[in-house]
Amino acid sequence: SFEILKLYSIFKSGNKTKSIPQSYIPTQSFFDKIASFIRLNLFIPDSRIGWNYFAFKKAKKLIEDNNINCVITTGPPHSSHLIGKKIYEKFKLKWIVDLRDPWAELFYLKNKFQFNCVKKLNLKFELDVLNSADAIITTVGKRYQNIIKDKLSNTKNIHKIYNGYDKKAYDKIEEIKPDSYNIVFTGILSKNHNYHLFLEVLSLLKDKYKNLNMIFTFAGKIDKEIKNLFSEKIHFIDNGYVDHEKAIKIIKSSHLLINFNYLNTEDTDMVSGKLIEYLASGSPIINFSNSARESDIILKNSIKSFSADSNDV
């Protein structure tokens, strides 16, 4: 199937199989900006739309061969829900829509340029899906569920099911902590995140304690400017984008875990799967956020963890 991210990967690295995270839209170079513009304005709702024809063809065969009477579609990528809608219309079966993240309110769309007609088309796709589905599942809290309800033309079954983690796979990974106090962050860190407060905390610590034996271990994608800012404050170890098993190993090596909520996500109050995996490690967690009611509820499962905002410095 055709995906713009494959072309982007070939151009950047010469390898179309090199992974680019779903929620990561690089905009550092001129080519990045062009690719971002194309991705956000020509591929609606997302760059994975190119596989829909092939996915529907395969799904049709599976449904016919196995007498399937219920389908669950999960996103992002939200293009998968458009496959589900086509299946629903073709076979008249039960359809559950699983929103792992918001759709039209998706965090990385807020500070990116999209034509108004594109925004309207994306919203139309979402409304068509939500109003067709028999039930809706979200991983986020009551505030986002209210946003969904406002979009519905009739009452739907809306359920909240948090992300989870694979305990068996998690427990197989050995816990090895370094001698230095190890602060860990895994995932994507961009200018859309609430990281400035943590930089302020590190500055205060650096000024007050000159010989702190402390490191900041990072795994994932990070904006180059942000990486430089942290490198000035603390010994920064960048592991780059790693597979899930390596990410869990890094999480389990922590003395403290850091989570940065996305800016402008106060209404949706997202609870990531990463936060659940953080909790499973048993390490203390600081969640930096302006407003994280749902995250606060989750973090109450650990007496050593809390959410922090500018009033806590």
What are these regions (language model features)?
Residues 79-82, 86-90, 103-104, 116-136:
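Membrane-proximal helix-turn-helix segments that form the acceptor-binding/catalytic region
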Residues 1-53:
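A conserved catalytic-core segment of Leloir-type glycosyltransferases
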Residues 134, 251-269, 283:
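Acidic donor-binding loop of glycosyltransferase active sites
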Residues 20, 26-29, 55, 59-80, ...:
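Short N-terminal targeting/anchoring amphipathic segment
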Residues 142-143, 161-164:
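Carbohydrate-associated surface elements
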Residues 137, 176-193, 199-202:
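Conserved donor-binding/catalytic core segment of Leloir-type glycosyltransferases
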Residues 209, 213-249:
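Nucleotide-activated donor-binding/catalytic signature segment of Leloir-type glycosyltransferases, i.e.
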